Curated annotation (Swiss-Prot):
The active site is at K62. The gene is pyrF. GO terms for cellular component: cytosol. This is Orotidine 5'-phosphate decarboxylase. It comes from the Bacteria. One of its GO terms (molecular function) is orotidine-5'-phosphate decarboxylase activity. Keywords: Decarboxylase, Lyase, Pyrimidine biosynthesis. The keyword Lyase applies.
Length: 231
């Protein structure tokens, strides 16, 4: 496994394009995230092909179901050889514990999703959830930590307070990373790599600023250089 802090979101709608794009990257400089659309389309064979290219794979399926179902899904996902999988912290402690126990003795890391980065205070109010996104994220992150998970997904804006509360060994995975001149797209809580690293982020998920770049490898190298400078 490499020690890169970057996870490239492989958000493509067909397997061929995804694999061709991945082949343009350097597996020493990043890991790869495969989400629902691409995995539903291409299945486990895609994971195997990405691993043959040398990539550690984050299988981003955000499991959220009854404990037994999530535990079984986590076990199967781990058998694919992926580096990391995730579940929704809103599934509660029983579900989180079941997922954690399903991976005991296995190499696959387990993290929890707190709040989606597209959600803001108005979205929470609409769902009847009181409190700011920061408060809800902290509550869910600490629940995941108590249940033995390796880390959580959170925005870079919440990373500083979470790092202080959760300690140095708890992974903070931050999507919504953009350079200062990138489009915000549909992410409400975004940050630059420098801000994310200084706030305590462990890994940065970067999608469109790399996948839509005219020169993806150059963009990846630029982001890596910024991270190294921030460390």
């Amino acid at each position: 496994m490499n020690d890169s802090r970057i996870i490239v979101a492989l958000d493509f709608s067909d397997q061929g394009t995804a694999l061709n794009f991945a082949a343009t990257l350097d597996s020493r400089l990043c890991r790869i995230k495969v989400g629902k659309e691409l995995f539903t389309l291409a299945g486990p064979q895609l994971i195997e092909k990405l691993m043959r290219l040398g990539f550690d794979v984050f299988l981003d399926l955000k499991f959220h179901d009854i404990p037994n179902t999530v535990a079984a899904a986590c076990s199967v996902a781990s058998s694919l050889g992926v580096w990391m999988i995730n579940v929704h912290a809103l599934g509660g402690s029983k579900m989180l514990l079941a997922a954690r126990q399903a991976l005991d003795g296995k190499r696959t890391r387990l993290i929890a999703v707190t709040l989606l980065t597209s959600m803001n205070h108005d979205d929470l109010s609409e769902l009847g959830i009181s409190g700011s996104p920061e408060i809800i994220v902290q509550r869910l992150a600490l629940l995941a930590q108590r249940c033995g998970l390796d880390g959580v997904v959170c925005s870079a804006l919440e990373a500083a307070s979470l790092r202080e509360k959760a300690g140095k060994d708890f992974w903070l995975i931050t999507p919504g990373i953009r350079s200062s001149n990138d489009n915000r797209d549909d992410q409400a809580r975004i940050a630059t790599p420098t801000m994310a690293i200084r706030n305590g982020a462990s890994y940065l998920v970067i999608g469109r600023p790399i996948t839509r770049s005219p020169d993806p490898l150059k963009a990846l190298q630029r982001f890596n250089d910024e991270i190294v400078s921030a460390l």
